[in-house]
């Protein structure tokens, strides 16, 4: 007589249940890692934007005629207009426009929470994953929201003077 060896239905169900539990736990941990990565990416984009902006403004102060890959005219005599031109070069260059979305010189930076949008935009409000730039007098106001909900602890506000 041949004896066949096989798993019983109960043993198979136990294995499937264990795999399901492990998968559920893994998804929870994985989503935490992705949120953390989005926060880090947003902070990195903000930091790079601020450094780049300050460096390009300094080029103008040192006598350059243009900056920001030629999209910023350094010769604007009105300080408020110069600040506006800096914001426009960062966020709204007509030749870089795609569909209804405005892009600036840092067009390769995408919003970590919505890759269909640029990370750097001309806005006055906090929007998750976005570096929002607006002009106040001769200053650039840079608002960044790192997490969904944009609670005070998850936002940043930086002013960059275009005249100092």
Describe every region a protein language model picked out.
Residues 2-34:
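N-terminal single-pass transmembrane signal-anchor helix
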Residues 14, 21-25, 44, 74, ...:
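Alpha-helical protein-protein interaction elements
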Residues 7, 11, 24, 42, ...:
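Low-complexity, intrinsically disordered short peptide segments enriched in small/polar/basic residues
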